Amino acid sequence: MAYAVSKAAAIHLTKCLAFALAPEIRVNAVAPGLVVTRWWDHASEAELNQMRASFPLQRSIEPEEVATAALELIRNDAMTGQTLAQDAGLLLL
């Protein structure tokens, strides 16, 4: 439950900061799902596949995809207060 509350707080903080700092500063966030990094090195391929299967898109996210999402938020001058979920559909569940 603590993780869910902290994630909700981060999303709300993004919106509050965007409102408070506009129009001079835009505030957005990226909320990635299962990003395969060295942190997952201890997991077996079977464990990773089980995790991937729990997402609607049944895949993990590459670090480069998170970077691409961040670049999109930076480039889009009309976007502020948004949290871009890059989670292979996890929030759909």
Regions found by a protein language model. Name each.
Residues 62-86, 91:
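C-terminal substrate-recognition "lid" of short-chain dehydrogenase/reductases
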Residues 46-65:
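Catalytic Tyr-x(3-8)-Lys segment
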Residues 31-42:
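Short, flexible catalytic-loop segment of classical short-chain dehydrogenase/reductase
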Residues 6, 14:
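Active-site helix of classical SDR
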Residues 26-28:
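Structural signature of beta-strand start/N-cap positions in the alpha/beta core
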